[in-house]
Design a protein with these regions (language model features):
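Active-site and ligand/interface coordination hotspots across diverse enzymes
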Residues: 1-57
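A generic structural signal for short, non-catalytic loop/turn and secondary-structure boundary residues
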Residues: 24-26, 71, 144-145
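Short amphipathic alpha-helices and their capping/turn segments at secondary-structure boundaries
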Residues: 30-36, 55-75, 107
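Residues at the starts of beta-strands that form the adenosine-phosphate
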Residues: 40, 73-74, 117, 148
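Short, well-ordered beta-to-alpha junction loops that form the rim of enzyme active sites
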Residues: 45-46, 80, 122-124
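Glycine-rich anion/phosphate-binding loops
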Residues: 54-62, 95-102
Length: 152
């Protein structure tokens, strides 16, 4: 896993450290990372990289900064596919079981927290199979529970 994930990490902005990490231990995948709030910015990115409990990465810090600019009181990041890789082309083979758990974690959070809109922060269209499959499945789930996705 180490060779797939950047060593370039950063501190979280003070007061914006995560209090929700699934799974809590650092491993080759991550379903959720964020700081709970009553009005959080919820972003769905491509796939996770290096961010963990004590160290952030560029993408996470950008999302935190957007949440601050929008006066949100929290931030939560999910991904189209949960495998850690700074370069998505280095991910392993698609695993439907991992994807099913990913969808389950996203849906559970959105429903339990009455989230009605998310930021689709997954970047440009990718030709990477697991991201294509992940995007289709995530968008289908969001539609089924009435959550709007904003992306550009």
């Amino acid at each position: 896993m180490q060779e797939k994930v950047t060593k370039n990490t950063f501190l979280y902005p003070k007061g914006y450290e995560p209090d929700c990490i699934i799974p809590s231990e650092y491993c080759s995948f991550r379903f959720a990372l964020g700081k709970q709030g009553q009005n959080p910015l919820v972003a769905i990115c491509m796939n996770p990289s290096a961010a963990r409990e004590t160290l952030s990465d560029r993408t996470i810090n950008r999302i935190i900064n957007v949440s601050k600019e929008l006066c949100m009181d929290g931030w939560m990041v999910f991904n189209l596919y949960p495998e850690r890789a700074t370069d998505a082309t280095k991910m392993d083979v698609f695993q439907q079981e991992l994807m099913d758990r990913n969808i389950q974690e996203i849906e559970k959070y959105l429903v339990e927290n009455n989230i009605k809109e998310v930021w689709g922060a997954w970047g440009n269209d990718s030709n990477i199979d697991m991201l294509i499959k992940g995007k289709e499945q995530v968008k289908d789930m969001l539609s089924s529970i009435g959550v709007k996705v904003y992306y550009f």
